């Protein structure tokens, strides 16, 4: 079954935003990597990731501008069993492919304008970090 694996936030300050999600919500860092024109840092609550995306200064790529300028919810990603079949179905339904040809993951604009991404199953792993997400309590 396909599943949502992360929600991506486009941010201006990667370190400050990371500190916020760690301190306020107890999210653990999964990984940080430099990808083409941006740095992507995945944090998790143990179930779903929040991907913080910081684009390089002056970047004007289609992906960087897809959700608009400045900080915003950039996209959500769905893990799929078969990338070729999923991409073919997306194209068949008339969705605009935003990513350059051959780039994985594949970003696209869904009906209604939302930017989405498909990723191969297992691309995003769970945390290697020592810290664990805080358990929710019912304290008032």
Where are these regions (language model features)?
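Vicinal oxygen chelate
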Residues: 3-12, 41-44, 63-140, ...
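Short Gly/Pro-enriched turn/cap motifs at secondary-structure boundaries
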Residues: 33, 66-68, 97
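Conserved beta-strand in the GNAT
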Residues: 51-53, 117
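Residue-level signature for short turns and capping positions that connect secondary-structure elements
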Residues: 48, 57, 121-123
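A short, acidic/glycine-rich surface segment
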Residues: 37-38, 58-64, 125-127
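N-terminal beta-strand motif that seeds the catalytic metal site of vicinal oxygen chelate
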Residues: 1-18, 73-78, 122-140
